[in-house]
Amino acid sequence: MRIKIISDLHQEFGISDIDFGNADLVILAGDTNLGTKGIDWVKDNIRDKPVIYILGNHEYYKGAYPKTLDQIIKASLHSNIIVLEDKMIEFEGIRFHGATLWTDFSLFGSPVEYGIICQAQMNDYRQIRKTPSYSRLRSIDTYKIHQASKRWLQQSLEESNGYKNIVITHHAPSIKSIPEEHKNEPISSAYASNLEDVILKYQPDYWFHGHIHTPVRYHIGKTEIICNPHGYINEEYNGYDIDLIIEI
C-alpha cells in the first residue's frame, strides 16, 4: 500500500496544487480548512481513492466543539472520506487509529500552570466555542478531550495486538517533534504531549501527526513518527516533502 501523508494545508489562506495520483490512500492529518470546507475540497479533488481525515484545531475555528465535529462527520457520509475521531478503521489488514488528540499541557510540569499560559496565548481559546453553551473553549476542556482520546487509543491498540498499526493524530506525541528553537517555550505544551510510554508499550508501526509546521521523521523504539506539514501558503518553505509516499 502506498500512503500519501500530509497535514496543515491551511486552505483558509490559499490552496496549492497537489498530485495524489500515485497513492493508494491519502491521510490528511488535520488543519485542512475551516469547518466542512476541507471535506468539500476532498470530494472535488480526490475522488478515486480513500482519504482518512483527521480534524486539527483549525477545523473548529469560527465553530464549536463538538458541533463542528458532528457537521464534518455528516458531510463525509456516503463518500470516500473516513473521518477518524477516537475511531479505528481496518483497511487491507492495517489498522488506522485516529484522533485530534490535543495535549495534556504537561511537557514542562503542572498542566494547570501551563494550561493557563497556553489558554492566554493560543488562538484556539478565542476562535472556538463549545456546545451547547457556546462559551469559549478553555484549556481544561481540551485537556479532558486529550485524556479521553488517550484512554481510547490505549484500548484500541491493546485490542489490535498482532496487526500492523498506524496512529494518526493532529497534535504530536513527543517533545522530539518540537523544533530545537522552540523546545523550551511554554507554549510548546499546546503542540505536543509526552506519550513515549504509550508508544514504547504498544509499538505501532507508524505515528503520523501534524500541527507543527516543521517536518520531522524519527523513531521511538520500533515506531516511526512522521510529520509532513504543508504549512501556510505564504510561509517560507519549511522542508515539506510534496512527494512523500510511505509504502507498507
Walk through the language-model features, giving the residues of each:
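Beta-strand-turn-beta hairpins that frame and shape the catalytic cleft
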Residues: M1-K4, M88-G98, H219-E224
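Binuclear metal-dependent phosphoesterase catalytic core
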Residues: S79, P179, E185-D205, I212-I248
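A structural motif corresponding to the C-terminal end of an alpha-helix
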Residues: S76-I81, W152-K164, V198-W207
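N-terminal active-site segment of His-dependent metallophosphoesterases
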Residues: M1-I54, E59-T68, K130-S135, S139
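A basic- and aromatic-enriched beta-loop-alpha substructure that forms the phosphate/nucleotide-
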Residues: Y53-E59, A64-Y125
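Active-site neighborhood of phospho(di)ester-bond hydrolases with catalytic His/Asp-centered motifs
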Residues: I5-S7, V26-D31, I52-N57, I82-D86, ...
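Active-site-proximal loop/helix segment associated with metal-binding centers of metalloenzymes
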Residues: H97-I166, H171-H182
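Active-site environment of divalent metal-dependent phosphoester hydrolases
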Residues: H10-S16, N33-K37, H58-T68, M88-E90, ...
